[in-house]
């Protein structure tokens, strides 16, 4: 990947760390939103590599940051904010989603792992999709299905995290 890469996260950033190590390349810019200390535990490998934006960044703030790069590839890794329509239309943005929304549209939105577990689904998976104005509505570019029957919630999170990392590596290499 020769393009500038900007990665966003709201949680720990562990997915970005794993993807970067497997690719042998770090994003050109890693962004997270300000959150109260008790809600935040950033992966130690990201210390000093992260730029902070407001907890609920504005369209102007996001546009100013992304506008520093010509045609950046923007990836969302547990970014718990909705990108404004103008940003979705101006930049090429992709989101990793830990719910097999190709088969289970009810897994769109927040906490798809918990939803899959609570629904007692036999299968789930992960997708990478283009970010559009609608939440988890964009074109799906990668997906992988896995059996989750009988898994504990912690196992489910772990398996879907591993699948997501694998999908991102494949997507970003190609």
Region roles according to the model:
Residues 1-174:
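One-carbon transfer enzymes
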């Amino acid at each position: 990947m020769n393009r500038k890469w900007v990665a966003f996260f709201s949680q720990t950033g562990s997915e970005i760390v794993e993807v970067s190590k497997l690719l042998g390349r770090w994003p050109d810019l890693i962004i997270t939103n300000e959150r109260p200390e008790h809600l935040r535990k950033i992966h130690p490998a990201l210390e000093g590599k992260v730029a902070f934006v407001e907890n609920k960044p504005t369209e102007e703030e996001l546009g100013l940051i992304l506008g520093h790069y010509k045609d950046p590839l923007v990836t969302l890794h547990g970014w718990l904010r909705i990108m404004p329509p103008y940003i979705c239309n101006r930049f090429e943005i992709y989101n990793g989603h830990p719910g097999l929304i190709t088969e289970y549209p009810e897994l769109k939105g927040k906490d798809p792992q918990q939803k899959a577990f609570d629904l007692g689904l036999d299968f789930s998976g992960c997708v990478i999709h283009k970010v559009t104005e609608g939440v988890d509505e964009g074109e799906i570019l990668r997906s992988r299905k896995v059996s989750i029957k009988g898994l504990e919630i912690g196992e489910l999170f772990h398996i879907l995290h591993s699948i997501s990392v694998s999908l991102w590596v494949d997507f970003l290499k190609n």
